[in-house]
Amino acid sequence: MFLQAVTSPISINSLMVLAAYVLLGGLYLIVVPLLLYSWMNRRWHCMGKFERLSAYGMVFLFFPGLILFAPFLNLRLNGQGEV
């Protein structure tokens, strides 16, 4: 009953468009940047030149999502720093 009262002024097409925007925004800002971080962390020292070029292109493309996670991720190499 409550859901019908809230969604009755909004058409089903508008809700589908809103859901598509939320899905694409979540992919662009959360899912792909996290996958890109993990892929670059594993492959950084063994990338070829074309793979590195594509990684730089993807960093440029997904920069807003990467900058959201930058304060929380530590990708330093093991063995760096004071003991």
From Swiss-Prot:
Q: How does it sit in the membrane?
A: Multi-pass membrane protein
Which reactions fall under this protein's catalytic activity? a plastoquinone + NADH + (n+1) H(+)(in) = a plastoquinol + NAD(+) + n H(+)(out); a plastoquinone + NADPH + (n+1) H(+)(in) = a plastoquinol + NADP(+) + n H(+)(out)
Q: Which UniProt keywords apply?
A: Membrane, NAD, NADP, Plastoquinone, Quinone, Thylakoid, Translocase, Transmembrane, Transmembrane helix, Transport
Q: Which InterPro entries match?
A: NADH-quinone_OxRdatse_su_L
Note the superkingdom of the native organism: Bacteria
Q: Where in the cell is it found?
A: Cellular thylakoid membrane
The record's GO CC annotations read: plasma membrane-derived thylakoid membrane
- Molecular function via GO: oxidoreductase activity, acting on NAD(P)H, quinone or similar compound as acceptor; quinone binding
Query: Might you give the EC number(s) for this enzyme?
Result: 7.1.1.-
Where does it primarily localize? membrane
Under the heading PANTHER family, the entry gives: NAD(P)H-QUINONE OXIDOREDUCTASE SUBUNIT L, CHLOROPLASTIC
Q: Outline what the protein does.
A: NDH-1 shuttles electrons from an unknown electron donor, via FMN and iron-sulfur (Fe-S) centers, to quinones in the respiratory and/or the photosynthetic chain. The immediate electron acceptor for the enzyme in this species is believed to be plastoquinone. Couples the redox reaction to proton translocation, and thus conserves the redox energy in a proton gradient. Cyanobacterial NDH-1 also plays a role in inorganic carbon-concentration.
Assembly and binders: NDH-1 can be composed of about 15 different subunits; different subcomplexes with different compositions have been identified which probably have different functions.
Record HAMAP family: NDH1_NDH1L (MF_01355)
- Family the entry assigns: Belongs to the complex I NdhL subunit family.
How is this protein named in the record? Answer: NAD(P)H-quinone oxidoreductase subunit L
Q: Which organism is it from?
A: Prochlorococcus marinus (strain MIT 9303)
